[in-house]
Swiss-Prot record:
SMART domains: Haemolytic. This is Putative membrane protein insertion efficiency factor. Disulfide bonds: none annotated. It is found in: Cell inner membrane. Residues 70-79 have a biased composition (Low complexity). InterPro entries: Membr_insert_effic_factor_YidD. Keywords: Cell inner membrane, Cell membrane, Membrane. It is a peripheral membrane protein. Pfam families: YidD (PF01809). GO terms for cellular component: plasma membrane.
Amino acid sequence: MKTILQLLVRAYQLGISPFLGQNCRFYPSCSSYAIEALEEHGALKGSFLATKRLCKCHPWHAGGVDPVPKKSSSKTSTTACGCGHS
């Protein structure tokens, strides 16, 4: 599913985006963000992050640098040093 969604975004980048010009208010562009989010987080969460980003891409938002959040580790340490020992 992730690959299909990435191919759809890539088709947009190659087939539609060149006719619209570079109007994205963010870096990376929304379509690049979508591909990276899908790769990093999978189809479900990646789609959610991409949709959330698209909702921010409008003239009343300042834009700027907005990287894809890194996947958090499932092992969270509760020790002060962060080593994970008990």
